[in-house]
């Protein structure tokens, strides 16, 4: 069966923003207007289609990226829009990361009252990383304090972007009535509650001057990106709408300009125009850079790496990237994937080149949040889910077994917080390990391990809310009862100076002995650089077959730490000398010698403990400003800056995570519940000496 929508009329987009900017409400309206829903689901009533997990409906926030397919008609042509609604809470940043990796365009939703918020900045940087073209939708124009112009200015100041408003609001707050279309130079008034009845009129006289200036700015910004239009503009020619749209589309796809629209999703104003902008301005899979891959076993980072192109063409070999795993209560494990090239039919086989495993494609599903529709095949540019793959996980490449390639995977941040968790009964124990393993399959930023000394299960994640949701799901979905400990900080160990270590492991016990001897130089590799191993052996003083064992011995010893039991990071190890014994040397002996070298190296290399530092933003009424700043300082925080936002103040700064547990309750009581805050991991830095000694002492005892 051929594809129902031509590829040039397919759009893969994400709805992305800060928590509470109105992403899910916007998506709900899109589903309503595209005919996917007959009744609008309201987030504040707990009825949103895209928020289908119980935890999401209770908290009114989006936790997992839900995918759905909708259709939109524009100029008598039918477009297919695959939408991913992503979470805005910083603890679920992995969901945003994996969604952006497979999208072609984004709709960034801003709250017209708050403007650009911290998670908006994080999301914007993530979109920059993947070069995702985007349009902005300034939402909540009906709210008290809504300010379109200020939000546009914040996009310039905070995000360093070049926003171009292509619409202006008519009125604001409870007098928000419609929008001015600057392209068409006309006003659109909304005449009913669901936004379906619209009336086109002349631009109101009181806004004529402002609209003229805004249109002039828009024309100039678009003309600057297109030589042909620039010539016409300078010659004073009237620029035609089709030419302007063509140039704006090219500038948007090339990430030179960001079109800005406005509306109120809750009041059903401006959403249809935003859908028009999605099909008019965001790219189809044919317009994004051609996907590049390497053959299995080739390091894509190497200078001489040879890349293979995978065009968005259904006749090319099949290539896809798995970006999400989900346990579905009805069909079992689901793997969401994006098809970059070729087509895939049910009943065929794919090769998972990341794991080198063949998988049979049993059933293919097109997802609508958590409703599913069986399909027989998927084509280049589609987003779909396959049921029940055994060995396939997030970030894996699946492709045609006859033409294997590996796509760039998805990189996720490391967890910064951990808690111990214990089952309440023996029956819960087995269920708990199954539940946690399943949840770890779904979420790459959630890790679990067993503490070797205490035997406790330790779960690690991106923040308190992240782990709270994981534990909640474990109890509800898998019916496990458990006790959860207090959150712990993910400290790290590192070194401050370079040191040469001579380490020898010799064991003679009659018969074949053990002999491994290495000389390793350890030095700091730089913040965030991780573990770097360099083989500096010349002349075979350590035979080549033992070098991987040395590298592994150091890496494994780094995991358990040295001075206080925290993982060692940011160390460069250079193996420069050593010796071996013809009979007694073995991989194990060299591994043990290397492990001893690392422990010695950390002790002698000026060891220090690093702690995670969080970037925080507190929005606080003027009256409570002093006590909030005093409190941040008392938590070893440092204030970076302050600015007024409406009648509140925004305080920005950095605070160690160790001092932020329970902050939400303290802030509420200090400000009578009138302040809000958000925080995200920013970097690691050395802990003060007195606190380091406390941690070392605690580890010893």
From Swiss-Prot:
Tell me which UniProt keywords the record has, alphabetically. Cytoplasm, Elongation factor, GTP-binding, Nucleotide-binding, Protein biosynthesis
**What domain of life is recorded for the organism?**
Bacteria
InterPro entries, A to Z: EF-G-like_DII, EFG_II, EFG_III, EFG_III/V, EFG_IV, EFG_V, EFG_V-like, G_TR_CS
Subcellular location per UniProt equals:
Cytoplasm
Write down any Gene Ontology CC term: cytoplasm
- Specify which residues bind GTP according to the UniProt entry for this protein: 17-24, 85-89, 139-142
The identity of this protein, by name, is Elongation factor G
Instruction: Specify the species.
Output: Herpetosiphon aurantiacus (strain ATCC 23779 / DSM 785 / 114-95)
Tell me what gene encodes this: fusA
């Amino acid at each position: 069966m051929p594809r129902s929508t031509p590829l040039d009329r397919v759009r893969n987009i994400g709805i992305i923003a800060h928590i509470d900017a109105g992403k899910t409400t916007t998506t709900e309206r899109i589903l309503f207007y595209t005919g996917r829903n007959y009744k609008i689901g309201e987030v504040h009533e707990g009825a949103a289609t895209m928020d289908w997990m119980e935890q999401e409906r209770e908290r009114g926030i989006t936790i997992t990226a839900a995918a759905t397919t909708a259709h939109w008609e524009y100029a008598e042509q039918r477009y297919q829009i695959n939408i991913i609604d992503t979470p805005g809470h910083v603890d679920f940043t992995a969901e945003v990361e994996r969604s952006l990796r497979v999208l072609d365009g984004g709709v960034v939703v801003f709250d017209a009252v708050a403007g650009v918020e911290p998670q908006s900045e994080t999301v914007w940087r993530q979109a920059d990383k993947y070069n995702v073209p985007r349009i902005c939708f300034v939402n909540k124009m009906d709210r008290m304090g809504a300010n379109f112009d200020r939000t546009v200015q914040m996009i310039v100041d905070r995000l360093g972007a070049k926003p171009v408003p292509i619409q202006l609001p008519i009125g604001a707050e409870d007098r928000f009535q419609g929008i001015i279309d600057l392209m068409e130079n006309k006003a659109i008034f909304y005449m009913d509650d669901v936004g379906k009845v619209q009336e086109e009129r002349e631009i109101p006289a009181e806004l004529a001057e402002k609209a003229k200036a805004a249109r002039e700015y828009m024309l100039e910004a678009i003309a600057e990106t297109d030589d042909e239009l620039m010539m016409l503009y300078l010659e004073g020619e009237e620029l035609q709408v089709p030419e302007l749209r063509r140039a704006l589309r090219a500038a948007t796809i090339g990430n030179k300009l960001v079109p800005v629209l406005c509306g109120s999703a809750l009041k059903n104003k401006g959403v249809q125009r935003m859908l028009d902008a999605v099909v008019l301005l965001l790219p189809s899979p044919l317009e994004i850079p051609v996907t590049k891959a390497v053959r299995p076993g080739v390091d894509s980072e190497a200078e001489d790496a040879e890349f293979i192109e995978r065009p968005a063409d259904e006749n090319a070999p099949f290539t896809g990237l798995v970006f999400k795993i989900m346990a579905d209560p009805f069909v079992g494990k689901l793997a969401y994937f994006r098809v970059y090239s070729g087509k895939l039919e049910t009943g065929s086989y794919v090769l998972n080149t990341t794991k080198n495993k063949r998988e049979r494609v049993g059933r293919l599903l097109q997802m609508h949040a958590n409703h599913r529709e069986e399909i027989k095949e998927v084509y280049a540019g589609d987003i779909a889910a396959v049921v029940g793959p055994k060995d396939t996980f997030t970030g894996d490449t699946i492709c045609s077994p006859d033409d294997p390639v590996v796509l760039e995977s998805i990189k996720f941040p490391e967890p910064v917080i951990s808690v111990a968790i214990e089952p309440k009964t023996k029956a819960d124990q087995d269920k708990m390990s199954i539940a946690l393993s399943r949840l770890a399959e779904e979420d790459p930023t959630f890790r679990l391990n067993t503490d070797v000394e205490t035997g406790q299960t330790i779960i690690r994640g991106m923040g308190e809310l992240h782990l709270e949701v994981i534990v909640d799901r474990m109890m509800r979905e898998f019916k496990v009862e458990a006790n959860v400990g207090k959150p712990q900080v993910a400290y790290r160990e590192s070194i401050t100076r370079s040191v040469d270590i001579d380490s020898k492991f010799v064991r003679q016990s009659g018969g074949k002995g053990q002999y491994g001897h290495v000389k390793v130089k350890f030095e700091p590799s730089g913040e965030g650089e991780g573990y770097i191993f360099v083989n500096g052996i010349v002349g075979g003083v350590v035979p080549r077959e033992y070098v991987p064992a040395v590298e592994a011995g150091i890496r494994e010893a780094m995991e358990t730490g040295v001075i206080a039991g925290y993982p060692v990071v940011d160390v460069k190890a250079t193996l420069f000398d050593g010796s071996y014994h013809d009979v007694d040397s073995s991989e194990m002996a060299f591994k043990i010698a290397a492990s001893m070298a690392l422990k010695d190296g950390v002790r002698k290399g000026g060891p220090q403990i690093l702690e995670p530092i969080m970037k925080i933003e507190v929005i606080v009424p003027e009256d409570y400003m002093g006590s909030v700043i005093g409190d941040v300082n008392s938590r070893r925080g440092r204030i970076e800056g302050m600015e007024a936002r409406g009648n509140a103040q925004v305080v920005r700064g950095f605070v160690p995570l160790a001092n932020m547990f329970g902050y939400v309750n303290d802030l509420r009581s200090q400000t009578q519940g009138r302040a809000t805050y958000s925080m995200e991991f920013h970097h690691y830095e050395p802990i003060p000496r007195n606190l380091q000694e406390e941690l070392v002492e605690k580890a010893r005892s």
